[in-house]
């Protein structure tokens, strides 16, 4: 029954242009933005549905999966995607107080190998994409050591065919597990993250673009593999639109960024 952080930013993206033209939409935009900012957890990150619910007492209850079904802590994916919205659509930058808190939270939660764990997608590719695109949108330097470490990690995970693919076992083991094949959505996430960081196309980016271009008509198991997260080790989602939406977004960002730079 609760409103959703991710759906709210999606709605606000859709309302942005119209909000500049009429008062009613402008009012809806402001209410949505105010609510979004009010939902920032005290630790600086954003949850999915509920604010400040990450109590160690709840996660210690003798209920299977209590840590994932009974709490809604800040996550790298929600925090990164909220930052990406605030930076690209709401004019927020690195020196704004909510952004400063969120950036500090993200940098403190980066894994040793350079990745971030994503709660609502599979898993380290998803979290790293969200974190990097969010950091770039609010003005963090591409040369920042944490950014470069994440880029190195992403590049190392690229498959021989130019794509990326991660197993759902990552979500359960809390450790990156290669799928052994590439998926459209995970390739798009990794590619979009690299595009956000690099001012010009790199060999890894070009190989990723080639993979997405070749796989647009594919219809094998990789296009239906679940890349949405539910309950680690128990529930995963294969969103049918993911194979189209995320590649289209990554390809459009590639076109808009590098075509204008050439």
Question: Which residues are covered by each model-predicted region?
Answer:
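Preference for long, amphipathic alpha-helical scaffolds in soluble/luminal domains
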Residues: 1-262
